[in-house]
Amino acid sequence: MVSPENVLIRNENMKASDTSYWYALRVTYSREMMVKKHCDANNIINFIPLEYRMCERNGVIIKKLQPVIRNLIFVKTSMSCINELKRKYPIRYIMNRGTGDPVIVPEKQMLDFIAVAGNYDQQVVFLAPCELRTKTGSRVRIRDGIFKGVEGVLVRVRNNKRVVVQIEGLVMVATHYIHPSLLEYLE
């Protein structure tokens, strides 16, 4: 699991072309876990949103950690490193429809997303971007608890007010119910 503290490690002597950003990548044929193993072995920071699901194997029901969205992985590295990765594995950039450039996720947005989505034991809810399209809420920051420092939008999801963190156009994750005394309104 990637923690926000591990993501903050930086190398100040990098060239401009080797600057690391968070890229959203599509991995074809459900090979995201294979790409994750390769990235972990080569010290490339990566994140796959995972959740526990009940599966049946040989008549026994087991709880297994599986990707929430098939074929999606976030990688923090340089463009040249991703091009090397593309030679070994069937991956593609997720492109911004407006500009035609690869989607680059801002650091703060990704750290907030990891803080919520990387917490497998909590009751978080993953949502498709279209599920909250018509709802708008207040921007808030969580002041205390396991999600301390996370910024998102306060929205009613499944009959509870939850803080929703999103990667624009790709995926959203909502925290469990957060008591109003733990919220700081930003707007």
Residue ranges and their predicted role:
Residues 1-136, 154, 161-187:
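Acidic-enriched and Gly/Ser
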Residues 149-157:
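Short beta-strand-centered aromatic/proline hotspots
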